[in-house]
Amino acid sequence: MDRDPSEEDSMADLSFEAESPVLPPDELLEGLPSYDWLLQGRERQVFFPPLEALGRSQEPACWSSVLEHSRVPVVTEEVAREALLSFVNSHCCYSSAAAGNLIIQELRQQTLCRYRLETFSESRVSEWTFQPVTNHSVDGPQRGTSPRLWDMKVQVPPMFQEDTRKLQVPHSSLVKECHKCHGRGRYKCSGCHGAGMVRCSSCSGTKRKAKQPRRCHLCSGSGRRRCSTCSGRGNKTCATCKGERKLEHFVQLVIMWKNSLFEFMSPHHLHCPKELLAKARGENLFRDENATVYPIVDFPLQDISLASQRGIEEHSTMLASRARILQQMFFYSGGPFHHS
């Protein structure tokens, strides 16, 4: 295939293609607050201190009134038998005869209590990225100083709904030539090395198949075929800059809203698999939600009180250095468990 020699000079050889830069251009960092940047391994990433959560002015709930109005129901023999029959009927191959005629001699009741703490937090990090330059205007340092990432106003999703968003940091863009194609927009095809043609795979370039007098029908006797990688053009559009020759480097803000969960179940002596107990539904006896919640300090069950303190401390320690706590919510639930 004939091509203009000037086109040959304007294409980069794929074998000498540049690797992606490890660090962003120095010019990109000059307009950013230096104390916001931390060097982690071979990548630069922003790690900002969280904003302090708003304090609470309310007093802790009175647990005596909560317990007074929260009565755990008592399961009778009739209720227990109905529950057993309901379980049997939910399985196609189970017989209800044994469940119906079963003699229940004794019902021993235990109350299983749960404490569940959910903490909704927001963390912000930054990453350097780039994209092909298009017709849109470039928002560079000449338009102002880039704000600190925690100063950027972002709409918070509904509480306890996890989400991730990525935003371009204002005034952080910088245009440079593409590091992959060296600003040419394309490079030589690796399949044909820029020739546009490759050796015929059917006749191996001999123009005829072995022990056959006729010429190869795939290459029409030429011994070469059009390169399928580049469709015979001899070059490919640079996948990094999409042929635009230049890249816009900028800092990208990554905001992550996540839920952290802490659960505790009161000690029990039930001979029941943990996975079944986890699925059992109790009654929510109390629920509290605020920017920060109090640990339970006056609850009759000391295990629940200690668990609430431990859960709040764990979440505070875990999130203090890397996130901002937006909202906390805890549930106290209880339910009767009977075995005969």
Curated annotation (Swiss-Prot):
InterPro entries in the record: HSP_DnaJ_Cys-rich_dom (IPR001305), HSP_DnaJ_Cys-rich_dom_sf (IPR036410), SSUH2_homolog (IPR052789)
Tissues in which the protein is found: Widely expressed, with highest levels in the liver, intestine, tongue and underjaw.
Tagged with keyword RNA-binding: no
Location of the protein in the cell: Cytoplasm; Nucleus
A GO CC term assigned to this protein in UniProt: cytoplasm
Molecular function terms from GO: heat shock protein binding; unfolded protein binding
Region (Disordered): 1-20
The UniProt record lists the keyword DNA repair: no
Biased composition (Acidic residues): 1-11
SUPFAM superfamilies tied to this protein: DnaJ/Hsp40 cysteine-rich domain (SSF57938)
Keywords: Cytoplasm, Nucleus
GO BP, sorted A to Z: odontogenesis
Function: Plays a role in odontogenesis.
UniProt-recorded name of the protein: Protein SSUH2 homolog
Annotated source species: Mus musculus (Mouse)
